């Protein structure tokens, strides 16, 4: 969190207006106790179907949010914070039925199971916590035409949920 104060003074030096702004970086990490983070690869173990690029997209996005929004140093193993888990579900199913009796919408859903270790505060540890996101698309579209965009949106949402649950504490 950064604080910035701006004040306007009149000719006599009297403050006539003042504003204070705060910039939040999204995390509430005590950097005197927590300096490093380690990630295990989150494999795609979906019982539904598997889309090849998803595993790499997810792992990259997860690491990126911590590297961009914290001052933690990434280490290969045994970080002060440790994240591991797996993509447990990726599926599509019919959502709505149109007047013609056919499905008008398809829902795409992704679920990730996360284990989190905070070595400086074990009360914040999580074991098997699930995070999910879903998106809908018109059944007139082929999944291959919308999959990249929708999976990116779901990954972004899930990664933000994980970040908030592990280091944002709000």
Predicted regions and their residues:
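A structural "domain/chain start" motif
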Residues: 17-64, 71, 120, 164-170
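Compositionally biased, intrinsically disordered linkers/stalks adjacent to structured regions
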Residues: 147-170
